[in-house]
A protein has these predicted regions:
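AMP-binding/adenylate-forming catalytic core of the ANL superfamily
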Residues: 91-94, 98, 108-110, 259, ...
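Structural core segment of the AMP-binding/adenylate-forming
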Residues: 51-52, 79-149, 478
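Conserved AMP-binding/adenylate-forming core of the ANL superfamily
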Residues: 12-67, 71-75, 92-97, 149, ...
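Conserved pre-ATP/AMP-binding loop-to-beta segment of ANL
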Residues: 11-14, 150-173, 180, 187-189, ...
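Conserved AMP-binding/adenylation subdomain of ANL enzymes
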Residues: 192-209, 216-258, 268-274
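Conserved ATP/PPi-binding loop(s) of AMP-dependent carboxylate-activating enzymes
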Residues: 349-358, 366-402, 438
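Conserved ATP-dependent adenylate/AMP-binding module captured primarily in the ANL superfamily
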Residues: 91-125, 194-211, 243-257
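Gly/Ser/Thr-rich phosphate-binding loop
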Residues: 256-261, 274-340, 358
Length: 538
């Protein structure tokens, strides 16, 4: 496999490293593995999984923070042909129970704790006679003695169940407008194609050193770092949770050449030139960002003051893979808000991504393809990076008749000729809180029984630090006391909702805006909340 070949080619090169303060977060010392050690460690864990009765095709939930063991899990599960379903550590029992019911896992792999999160206790909520709880440090470990008999067992298993690069490797999770996380199956080949697009966008070089601060459970980290690192023999340094001071220290001390960071952090660093200048970032070549719109002034500051280019990424677990780099434009305004129309046969964009993917924009009413600048429509995507459909759903309206994925995102064609997409909004209602995607419909459903309210729905409101936060919009029952923010939080926490999804504001209305079918018109709620902000009626 890819890892074995890199272990032979670069046995002593660093493959993956923990952050230096891991002991405070997990009670374990930081770990650093070379490519040879990663190959060996993942083989040991693969043998331990086989010992537990896990076989090819079995599904395993993995709830781990950004630590070395998570990278080992990806490699180990791949070696036995099983399917890994990574989930954020913020997920609570509510989300885990839904995921478990959807994929019928044979095991959940986790830690005792991560900071204040008691991960093993949360995982116990879904374990039963058919689901094993496997805790690193107790049930699984990287330091077991090599057992020739177990190695032979693994070899025999691999011969009996050879890996097909088109078979599912991961089931990641994305929040949808239906109100619950949806499973996104992705194969080895889908990840490899995404990795090649990301490597091209970031101009990755053999032997690069990456600093990863996004949770290693979705597109940004798996496609942006994990697979490119295995393809090119690059090193991954891990970071979690976000600590700006530690992040800067790691950039310097680990001699990082490329990193991804959320726009909120880059904005903060662009405003903190004294802090930035305390460190030596001479090895850093460029920085990627995404998950929310970028600020042109931030891109310009990094270029003019720090000598670094910022690359704008736009992707999703489903396989959207767009990016805007210095090769596409030097204009900060354009790079912050637009993406080249890859996969449209446009001259000047000759690249792997332009050949591997297809994209187009269609009118949301007629479905006709839009080709002229200034027109807005839904972005459709196809090609080697794109998944085949959500797990456990019919996917009838998810793909066009000619096989394109309906992204649910609105884009405008820009330029003369129209060579760029500008993200114009969302067909979907997803709330993006600091890069964590939250389904408002999921919270609506849980809040239906809230005492004191006759109607309730949540919507996004703008926040300088997180981008968006959750606002609970209530219609208070006659003669009832208005529910407080604590009432809402307690009610949701008792149902197992993850804390990052909790509303952080309440607004009361005489009635909720609805369409003729009775569906809440969330965009009207958002406008009303925004208007109250402008009028100072908080």
């Amino acid at each position: 496999g890819l890892l074995a070949s890199k272990a032979l080619e670069y046995p002593d090169r660093l493959a993956v490293a923990d952050q230096p303060n891991r002991l405070d977060l997990t009670d374990d010392k930081p770990c650093r593995l070379s490519f040879a050690e990663l190959d060996e460690g993942s083989t040991q864990v693969a043998c331990q999984l086989l010992d537990r009765g896990i076989r090819a095709g079995d599904r395993i939930i993995v709830q781990l923070p950004n630590i070395v063991e998570l990278v080992v899990c990806y490699m180990a599960v791949s070696k036995i042909g099983a399917i890994i379903s990574p989930v954020p550590v913020q997920y609570g029992s509510h989300e885990l129970q839904h995921i478990s019911a959807t994929i019928s896992p044979v095991a959940i792999v986790t830690l005792e704790r991560f900071g204040a999160l008691e991960l093993s206790k949360t995982a116990e909520s879904i374990t039963n006679g058919s689901i094993q709880l496997l805790v690193f440090g107790t049930d699984l470990n990287l330091v077991s003695t090599q057992d020739s008999q177990k190695c032979l067992q693994l070899q025999n298993h691999q011969e009996s169940f050879p890996i097909d690069a088109d078979q599912t490797l991961t089931i990641c999770w994305t929040s949808g407008t239906t109100g619950t996380p949806k499973g996104v199956p992705r194969s080895h080949n889908m990840w490899i194609s995404t990795a090649r697009c990301c490597a091209e966008a970031g101009n990755y070089q053999q032997g690069d050193r990456f600093l990863n601060i996004f949770p290693l459970v979705n597109m940004a980290s798996i496609g942006g770092f994990l697979y490119p690192a295995i393809l090119l023999g690059c090193s991954i340094v891990l970071h979690h949770p976000l600590d700006p001071g530690l992040y800067l220290a790691q950039l310097q001390d680990e001699q990082i050449t490329f990193t991804l960071a959320p726009p909120v952090l880059l904005n903060q660093l662009a405003k903190s030139q004294d802090m930035w200048n305390r460190f030596d970032f001479s090895q850093l070549r460029s920085i990627g960002s995404g998950s929310a719109p970028l600020a042109p002034w931030m891109i310009e500051t990094f270029r003019q003051q720090y000598g670094l280019e910022v690359i704008n990424f736009y992707g999703s677990n489903e396989g959207i893979s767009l990016f805007c780099t210095p090769m596409h434009t030097a204009d900060s305004e354009v790079r912050a808000t637009m993406f080249p129309r890859l996969g449209c046969g446009i001259a000047g964009f000759d690249s792997y991504a332009n050949r591997a993917i297809l994209s187009k924009v269609v009118d949301t009413e007629t479905g006709e393809t839009i080709t002229e600048s200034g027109h807005v429509g839904e972005l459709l995507f196809a090609g080697a990076t794109v998944f085949d459909g959500y797990l456990g759903t019919d996917n009838d309206e998810l793909f066009s008749d000619d096989g394109y994925f309906h992204t649910g995102d609105l884009v405008e064609l820009c330029g003369d000729p129209p060579a760029f997409y500008r993200i114009a909004g969302r067909c979907k209602d997803i709330i993006n809180r600091g890069g964590m995607k939250i389904s408002p419909a999921e919270i609506d459903i849980l809040l239906e029984g809230l005492t004191g309210s006759s109607e309730v729905a949540v919507c996004a409101y703008q926040d300088d630090a997180q981008g968006e936060k959750v606002c609970a919009c209530l219609v208070v029952e006659p003669d009832a006391d208005k529910p407080t923010l604590d009432d809402v939080a307690d009610y949701l926490l008792k149902q197992g909702l993850a804390k990052f999804k909790l509303p952080e504001r309440i607004e009361c209305f005489d009635g909720l805006p609805r369409n003729p079918l009775g569906k809440v018109q969330r965009f009207i709620l958002e406008d009303a909340v925004r208007q109250r902000d402008q009028e100072g009626k908080l």
